């Protein structure tokens, strides 16, 4: 749990903020960093997810969830999914504003080799394909961005689920 709190401190410093103490301030820090990366020529994002989730929540709920995590309390699975959904919707909308492409790699089973994880840390090449892919949630996530006309150019990678993706192709992203 402290890894995330440590990350928030580093993000705040990189964004020129004294602290990140709310979901709203997290979004401001992320906007700041995206603007920096855009100024350096970045135009693509890359997210590796177990699956693309969709559990919408109100702003008040999200602030409560964020504060719970800041206070080192354990989130329920539902709270975690609501937070991740809100996070991904937020960055997706920001990518749209910046005209970035959003890459979603889903179906990832992370850090499968305990020995190498302990030696090298997370995300160092010991991942594999997972077959858990709730396509209805991914469809709802994409639709939430489509209905507000904020879906960025999107590339979705999942070798086990390509047939689920065809319904979201449009002329603008072919």
What are these regions (language model features)?
Residues 134-137:
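Divalent-cation-assisted or electrostatically stabilized phosphate/pyrophosphate-binding catalytic cores
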Residues 154, 158-162:
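Extended C-terminal subregions enriched in glycine
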Residues 173-174:
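N-terminal low-complexity segments that are often proline-rich with Ser/Thr-Pro
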């Amino acid at each position: 749990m402290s890894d995330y709190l440590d990350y928030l401190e580093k993000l705040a410093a990189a964004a020129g903020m004294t602290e990140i103490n709310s979901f709203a301030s997290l979004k401001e820090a992320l906007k700041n960093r995206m603007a920096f990366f855009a100024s350096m020529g970045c135009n693509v994002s890359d997210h590796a997810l177990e699956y693309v989730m969709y559990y919408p929540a109100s702003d008040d709920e999200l602030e409560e969830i964020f504060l719970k995590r800041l206070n080192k309390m354990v989130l329920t699975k539902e709270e975690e999914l609501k937070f991740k959904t809100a996070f991904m919707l937020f960055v997706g909308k920001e990518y749209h504003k910046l005209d970035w492409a959003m890459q979603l790699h889903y179906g990832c089973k992370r850090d499968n080799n305990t020995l190498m994880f302990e030696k090298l840390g997370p995300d160092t090449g010991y991942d594999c394909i997972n077959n858990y892919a709730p396509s209805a949630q991914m469809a709802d996530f994409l639709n939430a961005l489509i209905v507000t006309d904020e879906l960025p150019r999107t590339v979705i990678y999942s070798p086990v689920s390509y047939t689920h993706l065809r319904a979201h192709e449009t002329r603008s992203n072919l």
